[in-house]
């Protein structure tokens, strides 16, 4: 009798259990369907890098909201749900990108192409990604740096180094977990389009790394700048370093702690001709701050959708006014932005015009896209073959 009761209760519970939600779902024609169970919600919207637009979702009789988007181009997309004003991850999707501060984590989905894309793993020799803890004397707490070593690293020596900086919404893992920098370089090296190189990916925020201990941080200068003057003030602050054109606290960490550690512990060259620095968005502003202060250290510079403005000459006038010397310092000054980037795009265009005004030799690229990883993966794929020539 007891067994019969248990069986009846079990059957009843199964009958009452809601059907599992499938999300995300990518169809063969590259349409993306997202679903989110929220029977009591009044409004649910899908947001993110999908196609630049928020997508209101429709509620079904089962309390599951859904929307179908596309067809989308083959790529890696981030998204989240806005549920009555609150951001939420896709609970059915374990593929998540870490975020920082108000940007928060987001869900990730890849829409496949007809074959492997330039950022996908292919049957080629692969390098390694190492997570290296270190004590930052410049900042006063523990941090980690992610380091890519190319295939065959153990048998080589004096590799060139690319210092690759992330944006405000990411941490040091960003260029690997969502940017696929390691796979992009594996593929380029296998195709003999890029030289084998070490890539150093530091934490761009002046905080203790999430995985090294309790939260510690310097005062958030960007938040203070935004409170005073909005986005323009933030861009100027990132580009100007200490506010006067000197090195920022992050830059001091990179140059005084990370760079010496890398050159002591890894098989890398110490020649400026074998160093490059590149960054996206916030990292682009940091790249300018470092490159203009220490042009003797890096012969290759690349800025992707950089947090910069045309007001750079207010703080770097001495450097910019001597174009002949500046042009001798850099073998490459590369500058790129997405055509539809409304966040840093206006400042980027002003900055490019300022470089031209002062006669600074540079390569300017405008690519399809907005302020998003779709653009930055393409940028890295284009930049890497230009380095260390």
Spans of model-derived segments:
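Short amphipathic beta-strand starts and helix->beta connectors
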Residues: 17-20, 51-52
């Amino acid at each position: 009798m007891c067994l019969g009761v248990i069986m009846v209760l079990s059957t009843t519970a199964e009958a009452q259990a809601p059907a599992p939600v499938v999300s995300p779902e990518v169809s063969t024609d590259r349409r993306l369907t997202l679903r989110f169970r929220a029977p009591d919600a009044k409004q649910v919207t899908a947001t993110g890098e999908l196609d630049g637009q928020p997508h209101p979702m429709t509620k079904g009789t089962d309390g599951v909201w859904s929307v179908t988007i596309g067809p989308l181009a083959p790529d890696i997309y981030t998204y989240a749900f806005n549920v009555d004003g609150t951001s939420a991850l896709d609970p059915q999707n374990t593929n998540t990108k870490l975020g920082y501060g108000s940007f928060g984590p987001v869900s990730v989905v890849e829409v496949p192409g007809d074959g492997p894309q330039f950022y996908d793993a292919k049957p080629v020799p692969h390098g390694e990604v190492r997570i290296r803890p270190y004590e930052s004397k410049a900042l006063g707490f523990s941090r980690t740096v992610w380091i890519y070593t190319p295939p065959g690293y153990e048998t080589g020596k004096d590799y060139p180094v690319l210092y690759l900086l992330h944006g405000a919404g990411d941490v040091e893992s960003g260029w690997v977990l969502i940017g696929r920098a390691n796979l992009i370089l594996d593929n380029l090296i296998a195709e003999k389009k890029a030289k084998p190189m070490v890539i150093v990916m530091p934490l761009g925020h002046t905080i203790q790394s999430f995985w090294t201990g309790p939260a510690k941080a310097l005062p958030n200068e960007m938040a203070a700048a935004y409170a005073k003057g909005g986005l323009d003030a933030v861009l100027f602050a990132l580009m100007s370093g200490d506010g006067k054109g000197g090195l920022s606290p992050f830059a001091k960490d990179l140059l005084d702690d990370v760079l010496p550690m890398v050159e002591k512990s890894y098989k890398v060259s110490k020649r400026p001709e074998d160093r490059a620095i590149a960054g996206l968005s916030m990292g682009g502003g940091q790249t300018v701050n470092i490159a203009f202060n220490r042009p003797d250290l890096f012969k290759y510079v690349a800025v992707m959708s950089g947090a910069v403005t045309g007001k750079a000459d207010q703080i770097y006038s001495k450097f910019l006014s001597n174009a002949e010397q500046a042009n001798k310092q850099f073998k490459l000054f590369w500058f790129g932005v997405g055509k539809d980037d409304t966040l840093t795009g206006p400042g980027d265009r002003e900055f490019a015009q300022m470089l031209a005004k002062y006669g600074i030799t540079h390569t300017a690229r405008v690519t399809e896209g907005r302020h998003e990883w779709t653009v930055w993966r393409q940028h890295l794929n284009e930049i890497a073959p230009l380095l260390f020539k």
